[in-house]
């Protein structure tokens, strides 16, 4: 298996030396990033229409009850996220006379951010040396596996947290692969720490 994996990675590196033309691109650049994110987002659309105006977990309902003073405020749920849900619910009530529509704005943010993050993750695996055919498989899985659109059509601390955890993992892996050189830039270190803090605070 190790020999096969090494051969595949070497083959992928040789592929990088050849210019590829076609709809599916996996180069580490803006255009492939946006294109693959769009593919994922379009494939998720049927689930988004089906699940409108979103799925709200029991934890989210509990946090809203805390925000409105029905339940006692405790540290069982993240403070920042409880306030965030409450503020968007208040905005929905003010702007649309329905708090659910305010909360759905957060789901829309998730449904935009998640395909962009998945596309970044896909392109990074290609950058690591994953062969192009396997990138096709990755893209199909991310776009067609129903768990992902159902998950991000839901609103909960887990769905918010993963939006920070994915980029943290990518930066962390990149730091290991580059033996720390990618973390030498202050901006990257600060970003990584912010992602770590946000992922922890939201979970």
Language model features by range: what are they?
Residues 1-46:
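Start-transfer (signal-anchor) and selected internal transmembrane alpha helices
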Residues 51-64, 72-88, 92, 96-101:
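Extracytoplasmic catalytic/substrate-binding loops of multi-pass membrane glycan-assembly enzymes
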Residues 68, 120-123, 161-179, 191:
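Specific aromatic-rich, kink-prone transmembrane helix
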Residues 108-129:
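Transmembrane-helix motifs of polytopic, lipid-linked glycan transferases
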Residues 132-137, 177-194:
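Short hydrophobic alpha-helices at membrane interfaces in multi-pass membrane enzymes
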Residues 135-146:
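Short helix- or helix-capping micro-motifs
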Residues 150-160:
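Short acidic/glycine- and proline-prone juxtamembrane loop motifs at membrane-interface regions
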Residues 195-200:
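Conserved small/polar residues in nucleotide/adenosyl-binding loops
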């Amino acid at each position: 298996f190790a020999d096969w994996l090494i051969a595949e990675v070497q083959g992928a590196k040789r592929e990088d030396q050849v210019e590829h033309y076609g709809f599916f691109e996996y180069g580490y650049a803006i255009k492939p990033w946006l294109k693959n994110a769009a593919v994922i987002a379009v494939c998720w659309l049927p689930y988004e229409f089906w699940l409108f105006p979103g799925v709200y977990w029991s934890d989210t309902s509990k946090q809203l009850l805390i925000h409105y003073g029905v339940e006692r405020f405790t540290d069982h749920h993240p403070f920042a996220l409880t306030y965030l849900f409450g503020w968007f619910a208040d905005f929905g009530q003010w702007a649309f006379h329905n708090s659910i529509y305010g909360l759905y704005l957060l789901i829309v943010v998730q449904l935009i951010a998640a395909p962009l993050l998945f596309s970044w993750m896909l392109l990074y695996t290609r950058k690591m040396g994953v062969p192009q055919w396997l990138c096709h498989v990755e893209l199909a899985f991310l776009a067609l596996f129903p768990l992902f659109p159902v998950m991000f059509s839901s609103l909960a601390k887990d769905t918010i947290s993963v939006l920070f955890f994915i980029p943290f993992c990518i930066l962390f892996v990149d730091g290991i692969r580059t033996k720390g050189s990618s973390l030498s830039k202050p901006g990257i270190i600060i970003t990584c720490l912010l992602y770590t803090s946000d992922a922890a605070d939201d979970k």
